[in-house]
Each structure stands twice: as structure tokens, then as C-alpha cells.
From Swiss-Prot:
Protein name: Pheromone-regulated membrane protein 5
Keywords of this entry: Isopeptide bond, Membrane, Phosphoprotein, Transmembrane, Transmembrane helix, Ubl conjugation
Lineage of source species: Eukaryota, Fungi, Dikarya, Ascomycota, Saccharomycotina
Compositional bias segments (type: Polar residues): 276-285
Subcellular location: Membrane
Sequence ranges of Basic and acidic residues compositional bias: 250-261, 309-318
UniProt organism field: Saccharomyces cerevisiae (strain ATCC 204508 / S288c) (Baker's yeast)
Amino acid sequence: MTVITIAKRGLPKLTTSTSSTTTASSSSTITSVASSSSSLPLLSNSTSSSIIPSITPPSRNGNPYILDSGDMPNGTVFIVVGGIAGVIFLAILLWWVITTYSSHRLTRSVQDYESKMFSTQHTQFYGDSPYMDYPAKENFQDQVHISESDISPGNKDESVKDALVSHTNNEKPFLSNFERPLFSLASESNRNSLFISPTGDILYKTRLSKLYQESPRLLQKPVIMTSDNVSTNSLVSTISSSSASSLDNGNEKEVGEDIRKPAKIASSPSRKLLNSPESDGSVNRNHSKGNLLVVQSKRKPTPSTYLEHMLEGKEQDE
């Protein structure tokens, strides 16, 4: 560092004096101007220094709380957060795709089931329906078509044959009810009224589901309800069992009595009244008087009782 030393020079002094002459004052003025112009300026040099401290992180050796981020790229936090958000989005998208595909398959299967269930092309006794198991279908066909050995001329009891023939004839209208689509019957009944009952709709769906569940069992063991509220199968089984036992004993009179027993059991009080010889005259008198029999009307149930019976599946005769 060089230090410049400046020697001080003497500066002229300004003296003022009063004199009567102007020459002296002017000369002094000139002298002062020359002396002031000949003076040199002072040079000054100054240096400033500042201390900046450097931060040194502690060593990670032996310190488990310091993460070594030297090998990690910049923006690691943003990469981790973006990856987690992307995984969540992909999981939601995958769940949506799976649920949509499963609901689509379920809808297609339900549509195929309804189209095959309610179509009239492949409903010949539900023989071509894929929803009916083959053992039930074979048993149903075996029960519908009676073998010729049961109606062969070798049978001695003609009444048994007549009962079996009537059994087959009575099965035809019952089977035709299964052939008819159920949805059309419900829609025709709904056209008669503009009132829509939610309770009736729930009851209809419940009965329809029960019918779907019980249709193979009904087809496997068909039960034909006659006008006397007696099963024809029980009638035929009673006749066949009684006739077989009577034929083994060789007593033909007991056969006729056994045949008459179901008729007595199935006969209603009105039929007993009509079949009795004492009631012939009363029946003729009633017809001549214009059928004066008055049936006592039943008291209509209350709305709450009607809804309870409807939900329980009980049908009331009007």
C-alpha cells in the first residue's frame, strides 16, 4: 500500500489596508488571485472491508436426524406428492371401470333372462328354457305323459282309466297358464285404473319372484286344483291305491265304494244339498221363483287390515 505524502505550502495571506490610493489596493487584489490559483488540491484515499460469515452444516456422521440428500434429485417432495396423487387417481379410475363392466354384464344377463322367460317361442312347458334343470324337466314330462300301460285294456277297473284320462285333460289348462307370459297379464290389469299402488307393486314383484323360484318345483310335481278344492293327484293316487288293493282281493264292490269315497270327501255342502232326493223339489221351487237364494254379503275389511293381508300374501275373496 503506497502512501502519498503531500507537503503543505504556504498560502498567501490576504491583508487589507486602508490607503488613500487605489493603486495599492488593486495590486494587492491581483496578487491574491494569482496566489489562490497556484494552490493544489488535497488527495485522500480510503479503503473499506466487510466480513461475510459462511454457514457450515453439521456432519451427518453419527447423526441419524440428518438426511443425506446429496443423491436425490431436485424437487423430491413434489415428485413424491405427485406420485401419491397419481396412484389414487388410477385406483379410482380402475374401480370405476370394473364397476361399470360388472353392471353392464349384470344388465345383459337380466335382459337375456327376461327375454327367454317371457318369450312365447321357447316356452313349450319350459322344455327349452336354460333356467330349468334337466332332471326336473324329465320328471315333469314323465308325469304329464302317462304311459300306455296304465290305460291298457288289461286293466279291469274302467273307472281308474277314466280318472286318469280326466287327470290328463285337466292338466292342459293348468299348463297353458305356465305358457302365458306373466308380464302381459300384469300390464293388462294395470290398464283398467290410473291409480298406481306402491304396495301392490311390491306385492306383485314379491309374488313374481316366488313364482320364478317355485316354477321348477311346481313343474316337477304339478298339482291340479279342481273346482272342489281337492288335488287331482291325490284323487288319482287314492283311486289307484284302493283299486290295486281291491283287485288283489278280488272284490269288485269295494272298488266302487273306494271310488265313491273321494267324491264324498270332495263334495261341498251345496252339492250334498243338490244331490239329496229331498232337495229336488226345493231346487225346482227355487228355480221357478227366480233363484231366491240370497247369499249373505261379507263385511268389507278395513284399509289397515287389507294392507296387512296384502303384505302377508293373503288373498281375500270379494
